[in-house]
A protein has these predicted regions:
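Active-site loop-to-helix "anion-binding N-cap" substructures in soluble metabolic enzymes
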Residues: 1-212
Length: 212
């Protein structure tokens, strides 16, 4: 994918921006904004380019059901404060949304769709669901590096329907990965962190020969 910062003709284009805003919540309050802070440069770039931004993301594992405590509302509020731009959360059923529902008001610049994992079609990588999402925008930007191994509709299938780009933070992650896979100077050790160790077994096996 090309980097979005190489695309200059973005004014009034609808940009479907896939983010990983899977933040920790405690009684509806965000306890760690790191994931939000890291994607701010991409959002600010798109705002500067006068694009119309449609944010897609998830929180938790609602398994295709609406779970109110996993709403993206706290995230939309935090982004509104940090960007000094209203991030309008749309809670309407995504399958019922069409182009006419978005950017009705001239002041609407950033729209956030409700938790994409409220829809079972997302994790099934559903063709029709991805095609519908794509119909809402002109281009797609993947700024969810940590989710990009998943064959989900808003990450994998959607790129079949729209011109696709990588976000600024996505590119930084790729460059960091290149450094530990192709630019290693030995002796070197590797420290791996994170949860869900079962999803990292293959990565660890891949890295073992490269480190001491």
């Amino acid at each position: 994918m090309r980097s979005i910062n190489l695309e200059t003709a973005l004014e009034n284009k609808r940009v479907l921006l896939r983010l990983d805003l899977n933040v920790l919540l405690n009684n509806g309050k965000i306890t760690d904004t790191t994931r939000i802070d890291k994607i701010l440069p991409t959002l600010k770039f798109l705002i500067k380019q006068k694009a119309k931004i449609i944010i897609i993301s998830h929180i938790g594992r609602p398994k295709g059901e609406i779970v109110n405590k996993l709403s993206l509302k706290p995230v939309s509020e935090d982004l509104t404060n940090k960007l000094n731009e209203n991030v309008k959360l749309i809670t309407k059923d995504i399958n019922q949304i069409n182009n006419l529902d978005l950017f009705k008001n001239i002041e609407d610049k950033i729209i956030m769709l409700e938790n994409i994992r409220f829809y079972a079609e997302e994790e099934k990588n559903d063709h029709a669901f991805a095609k519908h999402l794509a119909s809402l925008a002109d281009i797609y930007v993947n700024e969810a590096f940590s989710c990009s191994h998943r064959a989900h509709a808003s990450i994998h299938k959607i790129s079949s329907f729209l011109p696709s780009y990588s976000g600024l933070q996505f590119n930084l992650e790729i460059n960091a990965l290149k450094k530990i896979t192709s630019e290693i100077k030995k002796p070197v050790s590797c420290i791996i962190g994170g949860s869900k160790i079962s999803t990292k077994i293959n990565v660890i096996k891949n890295l073992i020969p490269k480190f001491d």
